[in-house]
């Protein structure tokens, strides 16, 4: 998860660098009036057209703690902040291209009917696709040298809402006619999945000189992989509007996959899996549920994988203190007094999150995010330690602690790269922090999307994996929520013992795994927030074994 420093001020947990946090003198909520003003203004804007009666009804429906926190925020913001509604997610400048190899019209796909086994006719695929089109460009592998395999790039267009999602597909290096297909999603919310491509698990990385370096442990060694920039205005994606919650983004992803597999039926017959990390812990349960809700579909969804995700905040936030205070396998980052302060803040934080879970209201969920993130993430950030890797300091405050993110952005901003991919925006950014704030202030951050997981487990396997050196979405919290999840297999899963996880040809283990009834948890040693970056060989090993069904319920 990632955010801008101003958003950290009001608690979004996808932290920017601690160095930037300190340099801009950002302490807790009340320490920076102007940043608070900028960050809270979108809340006012979102209610600009709300009637007074509904406004009062929503406010009066909050519990006392949520009201108290809104009162604290109100003291920081002058009345002028509520005067004019302005949309804070600025649209990207873009110019439509005409040179596409294929255009798939959702309206045409919507018209297709087939006869079922019962002899009755029904639509070939479900869902509302009329407004969607898919544009496809065949990428010449020799132009960029990222990989030698067959590649496609392009946009999913929602013409009615002016939304355009960019994707980049790489065929499997091994046996594309039979290997599975994986959709990869980075988190944020608001971070490009092309960072996952070049920083973690794609066929190549980018060095300091912007040269393409082959990755021998790429996830497309034995699977075809789609990297998707979503929601809109992330990476190469763009829109004049904005998506501000996970559920809305799920409709777009379903449409993209449906039209892609319609255009390329040779991949539609393969097993399909969704994988992602960080805020994808929100995305993936929603996206998988959206796909599974359509009985008639051409998406052969077989499993989902969530790495170092944020999925159940109520359970996970309890484990920031132990991770920061020396109980997660690494030395303590915080002092004893700071750890005690976290202990003291936990009851209020949990009460606020529970109220968000119960009401689902922006008025309850935004205060929960603001308070909890300032109490549990702010103290860690102020130490200068890397929130994505507890083993070291944040080394590059301009690029979320990792200089390579800057190299990737520079590479993807080159005109020849953009032309080769059919890109329509004028510039690329690894993360769009406006979107991050947008999701935060629409109450998406603290939503209980883990409640969708039991329904998913009824149909497909779920893997939760976590690098054990990550702080921001740490392994303690991920293990805890997977064990706290209420589902029919809970007792069996919790009784299952953690077993050694190691490469078949190696004696040294690289993690632990427990599995029962379609649910699997993995702890990956010596890996931070981005497991494939820190443990490339080991992550490819567990991916291949997972896709091969090693831990699937038979």
Curated annotation (Swiss-Prot):
Keywords: Carboxypeptidase, Disulfide bond, Glycoprotein, Hydrolase, Protease, Signal, Vacuole, Zymogen. Glycans are attached at residues 222, 518. GO terms for molecular function: serine-type carboxypeptidase activity. It comes from the Eukaryota. Its main location: other. Belongs to the peptidase S10 family. This is Carboxypeptidase Y homolog A. The lineage of its organism: Eukaryota, Fungi, Dikarya, Ascomycota, Pezizomycotina.
